[in-house]
Structure formats: structure tokens, C-alpha cells
């Protein structure tokens, strides 16, 4: 009487082992996908999150450049655009050696007074570019010019996203 049941019990045990192996493979794939998503998220954060604010009084760009010093950054205005470039040579970090470079370009609103632009870098690596908006009827000047980056000793007061 045990003969007919023995093979079916072995097949059920083999199927249960195969199902457990498939579940373990799916869990390993989900863990690998979560690690890849965290790595991608870290890369996005390190790429320089920016925020642009504009109202009737001022135009403001906030850019996370924590991996760069003021000497690594150039900010210039060309016609109606602000161009921000950051580059540092290869240096050692926790994982080996890395060099970074980025280019950002933003259109200035037509009412921004380009003769009164400022740019500063906070102690926590937040670059703040600011331009006052001119009142209607006044003419905003438009030409190419470099905007120096000054260093602030205090952290940025901008809310982090």
C-alpha cells in the first residue's frame, strides 16, 4: 500500500523545494533591484539638485554643488542665460578616485537686472544665484559677464528637498 504513495510524496517534496528556490531567487532579485535603486538615487543626489524660484521681486537659483569649491566653479551670464560650470580634477574618496564635471544653463527672465547679479556658496555646498527683478518700464541690461562666486561661512538657509 505504501508503494503508490511514496513516489507522489517524493514529487511533492521536489516541487516544494523547487518553489522555495524560485521564491529565494525572486527575493534575491528584489534585493538587488533595491540596491540598484538606492545607488541610482545616490547618483541623482550627487549630480547637483537645483531649484529655481522666481517672483516679482527676484530670480533665484539654488544648486547643490557640495563636491566643488568656489575655485572649481564658473558662473557667467550670456544674453538671457546663466551658465554654471563645475569641474574638479581627480581626487581620492571613500571608494577610489573620482573627478566630476557639470554644466547647467538657466534662462533668465526678461525683467532681471543683469547688472545686479550675485552668486554665493554656503558652507554646506549650496550655490545661490540671485538677481533682482526690475520694475516694469525700466530696461534690464543684457550682455556677457562673469559672476564671481563668494564663499559664505554659514550653511544654506534654503530648505532641502
UniProtKB/Swiss-Prot annotation:
UniProt GO BP: lens development in camera-type eye; negative regulation of apoptotic process; protein refolding; response to heat
Keyword set includes Chaperone: yes
InterPro entries attached to this UniProt entry: A-crystallin/Hsp20_dom (IPR002068), Alpha-crystallin/sHSP_animal (IPR001436), HSP20-like_chaperone (IPR008978)
Basic and acidic residues bias (residue ranges): 141-155
Cysteine pairings via disulfide bonds: 119-130
Region Required for complex formation with BFSP1 and BFSP2, residue ranges: 1-51
Modified residues (Deamidated asparagine): 89, 111
All residue ranges annotated as the sHSP domain in the record: 40-150
Residues the record lists as binding Zn(2+) 1: 88, 90
Designated name of the protein: Alpha-crystallin A chain
Amino acid at each position: 500500500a505504501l508503494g503508490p504513495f511514496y513516489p507522489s510524496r517524493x514529487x511533492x517534496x521536489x516541487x516544494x523545494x523547487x518553489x522555495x528556490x524560485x521564491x529565494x531567487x525572486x527575493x534575491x532579485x528584489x534585493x538587488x533591484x533595491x540596491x540598484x535603486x538606492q545607488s541610482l538615487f545616490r547618483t541623482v543626489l550627487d549630480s547637483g539638485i537645483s531649484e529655481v524660484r522666481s517672483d516679482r521681486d527676484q530670480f533665484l537659483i539654488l544648486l547643490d554643488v557640495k563636491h566643488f569649491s568656489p575655485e572649481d566653479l564658473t558662473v557667467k551670464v550670456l544674453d538671457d542665460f546663466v551658465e554654471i560650470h563645475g569641474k574638479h580634477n581627480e581626487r581620492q574618496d571613500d571608494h577610489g578616485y573620482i573627478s566630476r564635471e557639470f554644466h547647467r544653463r538657466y534662462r533668465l527672465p526678461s525683467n532681471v537686472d543683469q547688472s545686479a547679479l550675485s552668486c554665493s556658496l554656503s558652507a554646506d555646498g549650496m550655490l545661490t544665484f540671485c538677481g533682482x527683478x526690475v520694475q516694469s518700464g525700466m530696461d534690464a541690461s543684457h550682455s556677457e559677464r562673469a559672476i564671481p562666486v563668494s564663499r559664505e561661512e554659514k550653511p544654506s538657509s534654503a530648505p532641502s528637498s
